[in-house]
């Protein structure tokens, strides 16, 4: 919203009054009654409604939001979840509005930071419904407005399939699994926590990943030591072949809506927060990430 505002768009914010998000909006310079309103009032006033709640929040708020989606308005998503899995979310927009998507490939924090620096994140865009005939022009303008470095076209379905696969795969799930496996093996073989962490995580995140981001993995392979090069060339296909079936199972689970069912059912449980904290504590209290906390303190 700040990026759009700074790019000259007429933006109003809808938040629950007296919530942390409301207070943050005020801290960010939004003014109550001028460009900061409660959710229903903002939806009534807005011509393009950016529906940016969490997936669970979107399901909960949909009956409230839907009544303000009058003819000719635009409903904007940053994720294809609610629309793609409409049988489970019950998010079914009226037929006389535009429905579009811009999905930045990173967090809102990163998007804002890069925008302030004069840079941007890559984003996908999609059109689900074009009632007015202006959906394409609007989605591209909004994609640029939110701070996209470049835009590539997709569909709501492909966006959510790739996004859920990525989150459970190389972005978070798989990478944590690889980190944990290598760290545990090194510790089992007698390496110190510091050595195991540095060789597993610290060197990757602080040295190699930035170079890969800048130049590509092909460049990394061509510009490392001969020992590292030979080993990486010999082993990468073994890792690919080992995890390929896991990724096939993962994509099938996403495609069939199983991951959506699990997510929705988990969020609906009365003890979800308590159960979630136990799972997060398992990570927080694991030796690898306790060691990581200490290693980060030693960075220059």
Give residue ranges: language-model regions.
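Rossmann-fold dinucleotide-binding core
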Residues: 76-168
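Short, surface-exposed connector motifs at secondary-structure boundaries
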Residues: 2-10, 44-48, 121
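Active-site-proximal catalytic alpha-helix in oxidoreductases
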Residues: 133-188, 194-212
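NAD(P)-dependent Rossmann-like dehydrogenase/reductase catalytic/cofactor-binding core
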Residues: 188-300
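Rossmann-like NAD(P)-binding element
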Residues: 16-17, 26-84, 92-107
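NAD(P)+-binding Rossmann beta1-loop-alpha1 motif at the extreme N-terminus of oxidoreductases
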Residues: 1-31
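Small-residue helix-packing motif on alpha-helices
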Residues: 22, 42, 58, 193-197
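Anion (oxyanion) recognition and catalysis
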Residues: 5, 26, 69, 144, ...
